[in-house]
């Protein structure tokens, strides 16, 4: 098969990004809570519009943050010496601030179906390659036709604002780069112009420098946003909240109704008396209509009595709306949203009271299963990132079989964890591996703890202190 030109790859990648832009924007709006508001008739006043804005709550954002907050890389294991783990952690992970930036591909993977991380060598710091999250809005990765899981080429686009020398007006210039397995090609386009080549060169990685985080990829390589199935449920909750706010604003109190009473004042002949201005002219309202004179029956009070003329006048109350019905429906919809998203309902509703450890673990079992699935997919993606980083550092990437060490994000008792670790050490379990089970432990921390333990074991002061404490206890 003839090689496909980089211009063809460029056009194909940009076309795919343009086609996916509407879906990307919709997913981003729902995640940020900026999606369409509940329906209201045309011409409603500001009070209705204010309630319409209040009705929207970012439930979908909570369903994304719940699993993402449990995804934390604490280190890497390799088949080589332990110092390789430390080098990867310091020169790749911490050097690129991935401790905080790692959540970006996780969020993009859940919201848009794919997160993207790029790897590139640094000219001045060869042993510390650049690893950076990318937006799936601007990066497209093409795969082999017979292997939808191995990248074949990629396209990245971005924009810059430029100003010609001596000019005040700025212009937006588009840039793009095409990566193949062997080369890269840079392009540039000014407003109203065509894509023109800028530069090209060899792809030193020998691979596409983009790694995708795809939690819902199928056998055809298709990706699916994990929040898109929640859109109808989000709109239903917003609509019920809008109805609740309307009922609370306009019918959440008892209303008095008077029948058989005409407040319009009339003269002896039965003619309507009209309000007049000080100059004797008729008083007109904003629409230009004259206003009648109304009788005031008085203001109600504890020590007051209202009297209405007319034998047929009746006064009674209308009951207030029962807002608990709205609350019940909203709670049901939120529970369904939680079930679909595999997020415990107590995360969204706050209904927790006196739960034991076993009951809490059972309540969070669905979320724990979701997080474990995400760790498998995202862990494989990070392993590929580390391999590319090794190549960018001058290695081959083939001998670095890394394994991601995930932090334990489940709710557990620290005392129980320590008790279990102590028992493992007592039966001969390696201390380094046991220390790695402590919540928040990283490769650097474990190395530091091991060194401290060795220093204390070699210190006569510590030995004498332990003997003294033992004698006092005896």
What are these regions (language model features)?
Residues 198-362, 404, 409, 413-415:
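Extended, charged amphipathic alpha-helical segments
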